[in-house]
Swiss-Prot record:
Organism: Invertebrate iridescent virus 6
Matches recorded under InterPro entries: Poxvirus_VLTF3, VLTF-3_Zn_ribbon
Function: Transcription activation.
Protein name: Putative transcription factor 282R
Protein family according to the UniProt entry: Belongs to the IIV-6 282R family.
GO biological process, alphabetically ordered: regulation of viral transcription
Keywords, in A-Z order: Activator, Transcription, Transcription regulation
Organism lineage: Viruses, Varidnaviria, Bamfordvirae, Nucleocytoviricota, Megaviricetes
């Protein structure tokens, strides 16, 4: 819970120091952005390089926009700070106030001070990132019923805000790792803990089965036609495909398969993110199939073996990497990729939404190799 008696002068100083440290990076951000914009002008860039550059560009643009927040923050908080100073500098005869029949003067000042603190915090929250809010201890809640929601979720990839939520399971939108938040409370008996753990094990299996279906584009889902239209518009705007009214050299309409020939699943995922369709990240392969006509892999013959392997792998994971307060599970798509390789199935690692950085890849490799070794399975590192 947020402390309503917090010293907002000290807090204001910390916030301004944060902004000033970011402003010092302004020139570096601008130089990097200019470099990326020049690289994006190069023709025939590989799709993955093109998408990585676009993501870096969006990140830097957001950083530069955030730098302008200092002036806006100062304008919005200046009056609040002034009122706060007036309150804390108000002279008060404590002895007289306490011995009088109407000690309302103290109460009124305390109330005004707390109201001013809350007003300041509300403004500050609108300008600060969630990690900074947490570091300043401004992420509290005001009700016991929200206790579970107040527990921060941080994925091992560093993501702390972009998740799909399925009951108490949080699925990272950046790397698909799964986290379950368990409230560590003495009111939960041992039987309840067992039930929660069993439910989590069951849910992990359901998510893995869903992942198998999604890899084959077999999930039952309803995708609004508008999403396809907007994706096509983005692909045209970024010169990845020709406009729908473009003709070939003989004056004939260009076929759908030819128009979308170079469109990859990475393109689809990137533009789903850009358009804000987070709920459809898991439908990337199905959407790609619908747009391009390129059939996804069929792994029905391996499904039973994959599910059996997954049971063994998760059991071993819980034994070796158990966490009392929060249970994390490695990226489900990465697990599917490695289990397919275990069975000699030739699959493309780029078709799996995994491992955004070398550090993340190394972490997953270490965990998976440990699990495979414990189970007597041959592990193959991903290059």
């Amino acid at each position: 819970m947020i402390n309503e008696d917090i010293d907002i002068l000290s807090l204001d100083n910390k916030i301004k120091l944060h902004f000033e440290s970011e402003i010092q990076k302004y020139k570096r951000y601008n130089e990097r952005l200019l470099c990326i914009e020049n690289l994006l002008k190069i023709e025939n860039l590989r799709p993955k390089i093109f998408l990585d550059l676009l993501m870096d560009k969006k990140y830097l643009e957001k950083k530069l926009v955030n730098l302008s927040n200092l002036d806006l923050y100062s304008i919005e908080t200046s009056d609040i700070i002034h009122r706060y100073l007036t309150i804390i500098n108000t002279p008060l005869n404590i002895e007289v106030a306490l011995t009088s029949q109407k000690p309302t003067e103290i109460n009124n000042l305390v109330l005004k001070r707390r109201e001013t603190v809350q007003e300041f915090i509300k403004v500050a929250k609108s300008y600060l990132t969630e990690p900074l809010l947490k570091s300043l201890q401004l992420m509290g809640n005001f009700g016991k019923e929200d206790l579970l929601n107040s527990i921060p979720v941080v994925c091992t990839c560093g993501n702390d805000k972009d998740f799909y939520k399925d009951d108490d399971i949080y699925i990272c939108q950046l790397c698909n790792a799964e986290t379950v938040k368990l409230l560590n409370s003495s009111s939960v008996n041992d039987g309840g803990r067992i039930n929660v753990c069993n439910k989590y094990t069951y849910d992990r299996k359901v998510h893995f089965k869903d992942c198998i279906n999604q890899y084959q584009g077999k999930q039952n889902t309803n995708i609004n036609p508008r999403i396809y239209d907007e994706l096509e518009e983005q692909l045209v705007n970024h010169q990845i495909i020709e406009p729908a009214n473009k003709k070939d050299k003989f004056g004939n309409p260009i076929s759908q398969s030819k128009r979308f020939k170079i469109v990859t699943r990475a393109h689809i995922l990137f533009f789903l993110k850009e358009l804000g369709y987070t709920k459809h990240y898991e439908d990337t392969i199905l959407i790609h199939y619908t747009l391009t006509g390129k059939r996804p892999d069929n792994i029905e013959h391996l499904e039973e073996k994959l599910m059996a392997d997954f049971d063994k792998l998760t059991e071993q994971y819980d034994l070796l990497f158990k966490d009392i307060e929060r249970k994390n599970f490695i990226n489900t798509q990465y697990v599917l990729f490695q289990l397919l390789r275990k069975h000699g199935y030739n699959c493309n690692k780029d078709d799996f939404a995994v491992l955004k950085t070398t550090e993340r890849k190394a972490c997953h490799d270490d965990i998976c190799k440990t699990l495979f070794d414990a189970l007597g399975w041959k592990y193959m590192f991903v290059m």
